[in-house]
Amino acid sequence: MQTIPEKIDLDGIRMFFILGRPRSGTTLLRTLFEAHLNTITAPECGFIINMEPKYGKVTHWTKEVLVSFYDDLMLNPKIGNWELDRDKTIESLLLYQGENSFQNICKVIFLNYKSVFASENVKWIADKNPTYATYASRLMKIFPDAVFLHITRDPRDNIVSIKTFEFEAPIAALLAYRWRNSSIKLFKLRKKYPKKFFHIRYEDLATEPSKYTQMMCNYLDIPFREDVFDYYKKADERLKGKVEPADLKFHKGLLNPINTNRLGLWETKLTDKEVRYAETVIGKWMEMYGYERKYKRFDLWLWLKALPWMLYGRSLYIVRDIFDIMPYSVQIKLKNKGPLLAGFVGKMVKK
């Protein structure tokens, strides 16, 4: 969407958040809704969670505070991919000086992202970030009227994909624990707040895209549009300048129509031992999300062998929570180094 030409009613535009593990189809969901005429979104960044501790309680926004907000925004990892125009974005922010909410100021930032897709009569802003899967409770407090689209993928296929792209240490037990952790949290929240959550499986979306996209549109009360499936025709335009050449491999799926080519990869890509580790760690939660286990019998010995990696996975969340209470500038610097830590652990494991 182009820079806001005039002050608009931001309270009339709601937020929804796309939740899911990395390599679970979250980017596909974001792309479908970026292509929808009544919805806008932007590349993942996560600035809302990062900036809320410092700005969440601000109710009176002066020019100085708004400029400071923008400058702090630009410290966030990946915000450079948005290619925001500083002067135009600040000009837009200044339209909302005075009494206003943190929520609305965040919306102004999204409205300044220039998508290659047209938009009009915008009803929703969508924000997608894999880290949000474990921040849903906090997001509900920040945006009380927000809703959530939660997408899951067969955890064994998810492990294959993450191992391929080296997002995290390529250990089946660790990746299974991470899948289990976020899935349990979101399952419980969905049970407690059923109207706020819509769950979809990547496998169902890939197999019957029209059916399940229409269901999501009905949930959001926006018209279903077949043209969203033409997103891949603008792939080059969308990725040019917004994705580092080395990262293009992560977005190959955006170059093609939705397909089922990535379903069931685990059957040939994972070793039998890795499958056993994954299914032992995740246990019944696979069935709770509609995925059938190959090995249903609990293996205590295997679980004990996986325990160190589960504890390591738990420690990552503890460290992240510590980061979140640190001063903003320190927090951002540490979060910028997060991928380096994951890469370091991955290299050590390979050795």
Which residues does each predicted region cover?
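PAPS-dependent sulfotransferases, especially Golgi type II membrane carbohydrate sulfotransferases
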Residues: M1-F17, R190, N218, I222-K351
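Short, conserved clusters of charged catalytic residues that mark active-site
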Residues: I13-R14, S24, V108, T131-T134, ...
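Amphipathic alpha-helical recognition patches that constitute DNA-binding helices
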Residues: F17, L28, V147
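P-loop (Walker A) phosphate-binding loop of NTP-binding proteins
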Residues: R21
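A conserved segment at the C-terminal end of the G1
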Residues: T27-N38
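Catalytic donor-sugar/metal-binding loop of nucleotide-sugar-dependent glycosyltransferases
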Residues: L37-T41, V147
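PAPS-dependent sulfation machinery
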Residues: T41-D127, Y132
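PAPS-dependent sulfotransferase catalytic domain
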Residues: Y113-N256
